[in-house]
């Protein structure tokens, strides 16, 4: 867009534009004189939560029967090979197929094209340096990325949420029901770290530096589409505000947000286009290698057994969860909960980068995701929303209750989901 387009005047309550972002607020999040460095405090909370999750996982492993991935009571290394971790190992040993496997009906079967290459490549590099086997190296990569994600989220959101509240948020995310995934050979931790870094840089108006990080995020997990959508929505909002098409009352929905200058809007637009292009790299690579334009999407839908139909899976799966007649009620409740969360002032106060990311990712899940039991794991990219929770739940007792609820959720998720077959319960009323 033309650099000469002037931004509209700020509403009376809005602060003046500041290209440095929230550096003044970030300074207020620094520890007082004599206190430990901020990073040490964040890593201390992260380490305590991560260690607790590891202890719970090792206790649960003792009750795990024989599984497709190993014998009963698996060791730590065997435990790391569960579920999708094996697909990443196959990428290194077998690569990506040039011919998509198909069943007797011609439908594409599950294969490695569904998994992005960044995690196995980093794990291979780690193995070459440390000599560790793949699953140990991949877990080490995830653990490192997990720590980086905690630091990145805190640096990005502590200036908005408050220093102490940010530590609570770190504890809530790393004590959430699916927190074990952040230390296993899954790409969730890597994707979260890169997404937080890219959005945090965009929040500070450093769009050029954010570009390569956003591209790496697109090669870690299928995160490129919602990331580009979030950035695009943010740019459209800024453009509409600059042209005076957004009433002051509507602008107040994102309190404290500093409007972008014309040059910054151009930078955000460039980052949006770059991220959108990066999101297409992996589907294009699958097309180039296999000769099938739909190689990536056909592979992704192999897990659901049907073609990609936006929004349709939520209609059908809601009945799978609670029954055909209660399904619409469940879906309505989920939509209402998502709307209430996005409408909360605490989340809106985190700034446009955080709010548009959460909105874009929720829309992405509703449009393209098949809500199986993996839905809980795939909510982890909404981690920035945890920085709004301390403002909604005030007082140590309420926050401690949230924390305890997350730990209880871990007990259930580890024993019922990760440790396949550990618990066999026949419910009675």
Please provide the spans of the model-predicted regions:
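Signature aromatic-anchored transmembrane alpha helix within multi-pass, membrane-resident enzymes
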Residues: 272-276, 395-423
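Transmembrane-helix signature of polytopic, membrane-embedded enzymes
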Residues: 133-136, 153-175, 193, 209, ...
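Transmembrane-helix motifs of polytopic, lipid-linked glycan transferases
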Residues: 125, 137-160, 340-343
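Short acidic/glycine- and proline-prone juxtamembrane loop motifs at membrane-interface regions
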Residues: 184-190, 375-376
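Specific aromatic-rich, kink-prone transmembrane helix
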Residues: 152, 172-175, 190-209, 228, ...
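Membrane-lumen/periplasm interface segments of specific transmembrane helices
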Residues: 49-65, 228-341, 345-358
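Membrane-interface alpha helices of multi-pass inner-membrane proteins
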Residues: 195-200, 208-235, 277, 362
